[in-house]
């Protein structure tokens, strides 16, 4: 499945999505879904920011047929919840682990990182444990971004445990925060007519 946060202006002229596919780019260029991020971006009319969810290479789409089936399934997605409020961001650091989050109505958006230390894909148990924790605290949904912003080794048990603690602390703090109306903006460099040198 694929999770999305959809932002739409009140006049419905501006539409933007944050997309967290439950698949993994790969296995390698140009095979299968190696460029799945770009394909999702194009499928959504270049108005999407595609994030790396908690997934690993077991979730690669190995053939172009599977990639096309997946892309076609995006058209069938429905908006499950609406709202126009969010909290201020919350950030929690435990040792090398960092979690940042926002709460949109009852949907939490979490960003997990060990940056500037490197890391490989987050293990699936991190996702399932955070999702269970969020469900127990009456969140509608939790979307988890593996920021994957520094390449490195497989995540150690200690770092994984710290990421879980940071994520849970972030969720607990978000529950105490006041929500506010917000505005969003989105720019696409394709519309800027940039000149390459």
Predicted features, each with a name:
Residues 1-197:
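Terminal domain-initiation and capping elements
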């Amino acid at each position: 499945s694929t999770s999305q946060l959809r932002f739409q202006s009140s006049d419905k002229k501006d539409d933007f999505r944050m997309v967290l596919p439950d698949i993994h780019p790969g296995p390698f260029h140009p095979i299968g879904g190696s460029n799945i991020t770009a394909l999702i971006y194009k499928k959504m009319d270049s108005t999407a920011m595609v994030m790396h969810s908690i997934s690993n290479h077991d979730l690669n789409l190995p053939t172009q047929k599977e990639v096309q089936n997946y892309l076609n399934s995006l058209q069938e997605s429905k908006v499950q919840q609406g709202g126009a409020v969010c909290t201020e961001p919350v950030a929690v650091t435990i040792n090398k682990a960092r979690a940042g989050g926002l709460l949109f109505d009852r949907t939490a958006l979490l960003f997990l990182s060990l940056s500037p230390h490197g890391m490989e894909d987050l293990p699936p148990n991190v996702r399932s444990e955070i999702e269970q924790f969020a469900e127990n605290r009456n969140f509608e949904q939790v979307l988890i971004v593996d920021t994957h912003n520094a390449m490195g080794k497989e995540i150690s048990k200690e770092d994984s445990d710290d990421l879980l603690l940071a994520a849970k602390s972030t969720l607990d703090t978000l529950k105490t925060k006041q929500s506010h109306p917000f505005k969003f903006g989105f720019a696409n460099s394709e519309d800027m007519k940039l000149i390459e040198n």
